[in-house]
Each structure stands twice: as structure tokens, then as C-alpha cells.
């Protein structure tokens, strides 16, 4: 979120995030895991994450994103609302068709925010950048019927925003101890700058087709604190729905302007999802 482009300011607190994911393996008697076990678990769930991302390339889905700036008392003073359908090509390139995008009354949404909407917020980790992260095992949690490994994740080196546009995840992930797949994430994208701050986003996944856990709901509600002491209260809700197996013959589409997808094949009915338990 870009402070300079927002007219109304409010007061507040900053954010501290963290903790991260985890996955498989047996626990030692004290809830501890050996480093070898941790390494095996991380390797297992990151490999599953790569498989999941490849599987997602065979699906189309809908994203309904609402980002609001809030004033005193929590009233909405600005809004960015964008509804889109997405499909991917064989190389994993994303194509977007915008179906609803009224003129935003909140002008603080940056290119980094849009990048995170399609990357870090729903997916957290890029499976091809796993070696860029530190993984710290934080224990196990039980949410409803799921037993979950929990890991805190942080980049080994934070990208320099003056030299690169690369974004990395910092936060926590929850991994099912049976399937060794991520079912929940909580964190944000970095780096941040003096004028660009990002909220901590909590994302839940649901199981589709009895195999992969796809993101279905992301939420954030936070007061962002900037270097000069000014604050901005942000609320974000993103819903991902209508997952359906599909393959589209597409031409390049401008994600910002929302061109039409070409020759998109008919989409069969999506498999019934299994909700992620919420604490």
C-alpha cells in the first residue's frame, strides 16, 4: 500500500507477522523434531507444493478481491474491488479476464499489492525458490480433525527493492501431517519501503478432487505504520472460487486492463471442495 497516494490517514499500530509452515514426519517425545526429520518434512511439502502449482495450471478459477481503506470507527473511506477469471498456459503463465472493476475510490493499491494478490497472498511460497528460505519448526497444532505441523519461514536474504522487483514471503504455514500439504498460511510479502507497507494476510485452503489444497479465502485487517509515523488502516478480503479443470488456447492479455481471453474451452463442473477447518 502506498501512503503517498492515500488521502486520509489514521493512527495505529504496526504489524509483526510470523511463523511458518510445516509438514510430515514423526515427532520425538517432547514434541521436538530432529534436523533430519525437519529437512525431510520440508522437502516433502515443498515438493507437494510444486505438484500443486503444476496442477493449478490445469484449472480455471474466479477471484473476487476487495481492498478497503478504513477511517475512524472503522467506516470505509475508499475501496478497490476487482473480480476476474484466471487461466494458465502450459508454462504456468497467468491470464486474466476482468468481469467487474468499478473506478476505485481507494488509490493506494500498488503494483506490488497486485503482484501479491496473484502470488504470495494465496500461495506464500514459490516452490522454485525454496532454497532462498529458512525454515524453523514451531510445533504441532490440531484444528478440528487435522493435525498440523507449523513452521516459521523467513528469507535468508531480503531482496533490495532498489535493485529488484522480486517478492519473498515471511510468515507461517500449517501443513497436514498425513498428506504433507500446506492447508493454511499467514504472512506477507517483502521487501517493504518507506512509502510501501503490506498487511499480514491469512489464507485458508480447501481440498479439491481429494488431492490438492487450493486457496479459497484470504483476509487481512491491519493498520500499516509508515516510516514518518503516519498510519493507514487496511482491510482486505479475497475469495477464490469456481475452480474447474480447463485448458485454454490463449493470447497474451493485459492483466491491468483486462482484455478478453481467446478460444477458452468450456469448463466442466468443478469437484466439490473440502473446507479447511478454522480455529
Where does each model-flagged region fall?
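Structured extracytoplasmic
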Residues: 26-170, 177-184, 188-199, 207-215, ...
Amino acid at each position: 500500500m502506498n501512503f503517498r497516494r492515500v488521502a486520509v490517514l489514521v493512527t495505529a499500530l504496526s504489524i509483526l507477522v510470523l511463523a511458518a509452515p510445516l509438514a510430515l514426519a514423526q515427532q520425538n517425545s517432547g514434541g521436538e523434531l530432529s534436523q533430519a526429520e525437519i529437512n525431510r518434512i520440508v522437502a516433502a511439502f515443498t515438493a507437494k507444493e510444486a505438484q500443486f502449482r503444476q496442477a493449478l495450471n490445469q484449472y480455471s478459477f474466479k477471484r473476487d478481491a476487495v481492498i478497503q481503506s478504513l477511517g475512524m470507527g472503522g467506516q470505509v473511506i475508499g475501496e478497490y474491488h476487482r473480480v476476474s477469471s484466471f487461466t494458465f498456459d502450459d508454462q504456468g503463465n497467468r491470464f486474466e479476464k476482468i468481469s467487474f472493476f468499478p473506478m476505485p475510490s481507494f488509490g493506494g493499491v500498488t503494483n506490488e499489492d497486485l503482484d501479491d494478490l496473484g502470488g504470495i497472498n494465496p500461495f506464500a511460497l514459490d516452490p522454485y525458490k525454496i532454497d532462498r528460505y529458512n525454515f524453523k519448526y514451531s510445533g504441532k497444532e490440531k484444528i478440528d480433525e487435522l493435525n498440523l505441523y507449523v513452521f516459521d519461514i523467513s528469507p535468508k536474504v531480503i531482496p533490495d527493492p532498489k535493485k529488484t522487483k522480486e517478492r519473498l514471503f515471511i510468515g507461517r504455514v500449517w501443513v497436514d501431517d498425513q498428506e504433507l500439504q500446506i492447508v493454511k498460511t499467514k504472512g506477507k510479502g517483502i521487501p517493504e519501503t518507506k512509502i510501501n507497507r503490506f498487511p499480514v494476510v491469512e489464507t485458508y485452503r480447501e481440498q479439491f478432487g481429494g488431492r490438492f489444497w487450493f486457496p479459497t479465502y484470504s483476509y487481512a485487517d491491519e493498520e500499516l505504520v509508515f516510516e514518518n509515523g503516519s498510519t493507514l488502516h487496511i482491510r482486505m478480503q479475497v475469495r477464490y472460487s469456481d475452480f474447474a479443470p480447463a485448458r485454454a488456447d490463449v493470447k497474451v492479455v493485459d492483466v491491468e486492463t483486462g482484455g478478453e481471453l481467446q478460444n477458452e474451452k468450456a469448463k466442466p463442473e468443478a469437484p466439490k471442495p473440502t473446507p479447511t477447518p478454522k480455529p
